[in-house]
């Protein structure tokens, strides 16, 4: 069986069927959910900052606070619209700042907290109590704490959301198998921020985002739209620039993403790139056009469900370590396979094709109808020799 004989028309037929539906499904977000407005954005940013300055911080609620901060940047009205457009029945809780009295070592103290149903006043108070301990330690060590080391630095919330952007890149796997890659990438891109904040612990923050998204899947819709809005806004801080790069890389619109990752060097970070094993097949274009029609979210919502995207994706070959077959055939690199493939014929064909590419060192780019700019980007990215590119 050769890959060129594999027919992948089922996706188009199913898409036509789904498009004819006259009905929509309404989902419930459960009880009241917190939807903060712009006016509490500064306070949510400070909550993120308190967690970041706290040495050995407990990041159990950091993912939730980060998502709430993203909502506050979108605003209450737009967040509600995003959820309703996604088919969610929403009962929204307004969020305000109030004074909370809490006993601390036998002494009553006052804290400014938010009226959140998802995070008690006591938990918010405890976050501030722990951060004050770390702040006092910083004062002793530094004498004076520079603005960029403080808990109220304006980029604290975006630092936390940079970790969220990395987590989003791994959601298609359906589990936390991408956590190691998230940690490694965060350690690299946020290295300057980690020097500023001892509480910036990528592993703990990433796990917190995984947990909040698993518990509240509607937050994915909110975060995707926030990421697009944030990345399309000109200007901003250095950390906002880092976030835009990370998010657009995940979303599929970064300049290193060509044809949804078919030829991208970092294919393992791309959702629909996993689907495109056929680097010399016309179906690659079909996958790409289908992805364009669905929008960037196709990577998040469809790779687990539609037959084409799951054909050679992580969901179809869960034990294929290092690279999935889509990467292997697209780049001519084979990883180690452990376990029994669901479709042995298809696996054997893909393996033979990938090994052929690897042996010959030739990738046929001509079938993708690439523009001059895209082809140049490939050359710059993969650094092929002239005789390694078949045009």
From Swiss-Prot:
Subcellular location: Virion; Host cytoplasm
Superkingdom of origin organism: Viruses
GO molecular function, one term: RNA binding
Keywords: Capsid protein, Helical capsid protein, Host cytoplasm, Host-virus interaction, Inhibition of host innate immune response by virus, Inhibition of host interferon signaling pathway by virus, Inhibition of host MAVS by virus, Inhibition of host MDA5 by virus, Inhibition of host NF-kappa-B by virus, Inhibition of host PKR by virus, Inhibition of host RLR pathway by virus, Interferon antiviral system evasion, Phosphoprotein, Ribonucleoprotein, RNA-binding, Viral immunoevasion, Viral nucleoprotein, Virion
Species per Swiss-Prot/TrEMBL record: Bovine respiratory syncytial virus (strain A51908)
Assembly with partners or alone: Homomultimerizes to form the nucleocapsid. Binds to viral genomic RNA. Interacts with the phosphoprotein P. When in a monomeric RNA-free form, interacts with the phosphoprotein (via N-terminus). Interacts with protein M2-1; this interaction allows the association of nucleocapsid with the matrix protein. Interacts with host EIF2AK2/PKR; this interaction inhibits EIF2AK2 phosphorylation of EIF2S1 and blocks EIF2AK2-mediated translation shutoff.
Family: Belongs to the paramyxoviruses nucleocapsid family.
Leader sequence segment: none
Description of post-translational modifications: Tyrosine phosphorylation modulates viral transcription and replication.
Function, as annotated: Encapsidates the viral RNA genome by forming a left-handed helical nucleocapsid that protects the RNA from nucleases. RNA replication depends on the availability of soluble nucleoprotein. The encapsidated genomic RNA is termed the NC and serves as template for transcription and replication. Together with the phosphoprotein, sequesters host NF-kappa-B in inclusion bodies (IBs) thereby inhibiting this host defense pathway. May also act as a modulator of the innate immune response by sequestration of host IFIH1/MDA5 and MAVS into IBs.
Listed result of changing residue 391 to E/G: Complete loss of viral RNA synthesis
Ribonucleoprotein among keywords: yes
Protein name: Nucleoprotein
InterPro entries: Pneumo_ncap
GO biological process, one term: symbiont-mediated suppression of host cytoplasmic pattern recognition receptor signaling pathway via inhibition of MAVS activity
Stretch list, region Interaction with the phosphoprotein: 244-290, 338-364
Residues carrying Phosphotyrosine: 38
Consequence the record notes for mutating residue 391 to A/K: About 80-95% inhibition of viral RNA synthesis
Reported impact of residue 213 to F: In strain: ATCC 51908
Gene Ontology annotations for the cellular component aspect, listed alphabetically: helical viral capsid; host cell cytoplasm; ribonucleoprotein complex; viral nucleocapsid
Stretches for region Involved in RNA synthesis and encapsidation: 1-364
